[in-house]
Amino acid sequence: MSTGTFIVSQPLNYRGGARVDPVDASGTEKAFEPATGRVIATFTCSGEKEVNLAVQDAKAAFKIWSQKSGMERCRILLEAARIIRERKEEIATMETINNGKSIFEARLDVDISWQCLEYYAGLAGSMAGEHIQLPGGSFGYTRREPLGVCVGIGAWNYPFQIACWKSAPALACGNAMIFKPSPFTPLSVLLLAEIYTEAGVPPGLFNVVQGGATTGQLLCQHRDVAKISFTGSVPTGSKIMEMSAKGIKPVTLELGGKSPLIIFSDCDMGNAVKGALMANFLTQGEVCCNGTRVFVQKEILDKFTEEVVKQTQRIKIGDPLLEDTRMGPLINRPHLERILGFVKVAKEQGAKVLCGGDLYVPEDPKLKEGYYMRPCVLTNCRDDMTCVKEEIFGPVMSILSFDTEAEVVERANDTTFGLAAGVFTRDIQRAHRVVAELQAGMCFINNYNVSPVELPFGGYKKSGFGRENGRVTIEYYSQLKTVCVEMGDVESVF
C-alpha cells in the first residue's frame, strides 16, 4: 500500500465479535491521512443505545471469560500476540497512514504491542491470593478477582500500542474491555479487536466504540462500567476523573508532561545527543513523556548544542511509508498551526531558533497538503518562557543552561507535571542521587524514551496516577476479596 491510496470501506465499531455500524449516533467525525491531508474515513460517533449494547455484550462475555483459569486466558493472549507478530506489516502500515509516524517507528510500536500481550499472558496464570493462619486453627485467605467491564480511552499518538497496554492486563485479570480510540485515529484498534476474536476470546469481550467527548461521557457514566483507563490531556483527564467519581469508579490517568532531560558535563556526549533527539523527536514530538526541557551544564553547552543542531538537521522528513523517512507529518492541521504558534511566541519572548520551526513542503505533489514541519531547536530559553512551561506536543526542543546539580534539580521540579525525567552522566552516584530527587514517575539514566513492558509507566502530580505495564498494573485491573474461615465455635459477646 502506498501513501494517498487508502480509503476506509468497513464499519469502524466492533461489537459481539464483528464490525458493526452503530445503532444510534452522537455526531459524525472525519479521519485524515496526515501525509496528504486526505479524508480517509467519515464515521458515526456512538450514541447511548450503541454504548449500552457494547456494555451489554461485554458483560455477557465477562461471565464466560472470568470463569476461565489463568492458564486458559494465558494461551489465548499468547495466540493473539502471535497473530500480531504475523500481521506486523499490515498493522504498522495502518498506523502510519492514520497517525503519520514513520513506518520504521510504527513497526517498533507493533513489536512493543505483542511483547505486552506476551508479558501479561505470563502473569495471567500466576495471579494468586494469600493464605493467613489465624489462632485456633482458623485461617483467612485472599482472592484476586477481576473488576468487570473496563473502559479504555486512547490517545492518537500511539493508537495500537495504547490499546494493547490497556487491554492486555485487563484481559489477563479476567475483565472485559470497551475501547474508545481518539476520533483522529480510529482505524488500527479494529485490527486488534479482530485479532482477539481470532485468538479465541468470547464475542463481546473486547468491543470498540467510536466517538468524541459525548461518547466518552456515556462510557464514563455508565452504571455497569467498573473502571476507566485514560491516556490524553490533563483537562480531559480531570473531566474523566470527575465523571468517574460520581459512580465511585477507579481510574488510571496517563496525562501530559513537560519533562526535564539533564545533561551533565561528564556525560558521554554522543549518547547524550542521541538521547536528546530520542527525547524530543519520536513520533514528530507528539509523545507525552518527551524530555523537552533539555538542561545542559554550561561547560559543554556550546559543543552539545552544535552537535544537536547538526543531527536534527539530518533527520529525513517526508512520506512516512518510505523506508528512509524518520519524521512524518503531524496529526492534523490545527495541531500543526498550534505548534508553529508556540515557536512564534518563543521567538517573541527572546528564544533563538537554531534550526527548523517552520513549515516543510515535500517535493512529492501528493504530499503538498500534508501537515509537515521541520524539527526545531531553541536556545536562549528561560524557565518562565511559554515554550519551557507548557506542553507543546510537537518537534520543539528547548535548551537551557545550568551550573550546579542542586540548581538544576530545583528547576527541573518546578513544574505542575511529573511524568518523566532523564539524566546523562558518567558519575553513577550522581545519577542515582539526582533521580531520587526528581519528581517524576518514569526516570531514565543514560537513555530516554525506552519502554520495556516489564517496567511500570506513569506519572506524578498533574501527569496522572495509576500505572501501565509491569506487574503492578495487575493491581489496577483487579480487586482483593478477603475470606475469614472459622474452624471452631463462634465466641459471642451476647
UniProtKB/Swiss-Prot annotation:
Q: Which GO terms describe its biological process?
A: aldehyde metabolic process; carnitine biosynthetic process; protein homotetramerization
**Record bears the keyword Oxidoreductase:** yes
Q: Main site of residence?
A: cytoplasm
Reactions catalysed = 4-(trimethylamino)butanal + NAD(+) + H2O = 4-(trimethylamino)butanoate + NADH + 2 H(+); an aldehyde + NAD(+) + H2O = a carboxylate + NADH + 2 H(+); 4-aminobutanal + NAD(+) + H2O = 4-aminobutanoate + NADH + 2 H(+); formaldehyde + NAD(+) + H2O = formate + NADH + 2 H(+)
Tell me which EC number(s) this protein carries.
1.2.1.47, 1.2.1.3, 1.2.1.46, 1.2.1.19
For NAD(+), which residues are the binding ones? 180, 232-236, 391
- Which keywords label this protein? Acetylation, Cytoplasm, NAD, Oxidoreductase
**Localisation:** Cytoplasm, Cytosol; Cytoplasm
Q: Which Pfam families match?
A: Aldedh
Q: Give the positions the UniProt entry annotates as the active site.
A: 254, 288
Q: Report the GO terms under cellular component.
A: cytoplasm; cytosol
- Sites bearing N6-succinyllysine, chain numbering: 30, 59, 303
Q: How does it assemble?
A: Homotetramer.
Record's protein name: 4-trimethylaminobutyraldehyde dehydrogenase
Q: Which source organism does the UniProt entry give?
A: Sus scrofa (Pig)
Q: Which gene encodes it?
A: ALDH9A1
